[in-house]
């Protein structure tokens, strides 16, 4: 498996109807929960004061990450930054593979 640090900034248009925004957010929340339970979306943190998050994904390949990110309901409204991660030799944790 491969770990990726992903920052997602969400920018919904001000003109988007509230009902559409609420449905997109509900769909996103459901998919995010499923992916977390599956172990693919390993960590999810909100960035204080922003409509953004920092996440760690644990997937088999860059292609799988791309497919996963582009399947997110909010993807069309996101600016995404991806950084591949590898284990640091000085880490004292055995489970941060």
Where would I find each of the regions flagged by the language model?
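Conserved, structured core segments of small domains
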Residues: 1-97
């Amino acid at each position: 498996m491969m770990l990726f640090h992903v920052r997602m900034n969400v920018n919904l248009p001000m003109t988007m109807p509230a009902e559409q925004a609420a449905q997109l957010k509900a769909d996103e929340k459901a998919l995010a929960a499923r992916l977390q339970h599956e172990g693919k979306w390993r960590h999810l943190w909100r960035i204080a004061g922003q409509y953004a998050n920092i996440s760690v994904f644990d997937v088999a390949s860059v292609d799988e990450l791309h497919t996963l990110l582009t399947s997110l309901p909010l993807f069309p409204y996101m600016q995404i930054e991806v950084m591949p991660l590898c284990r640091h030799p000085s880490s004292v944790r055995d489970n941060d593979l």
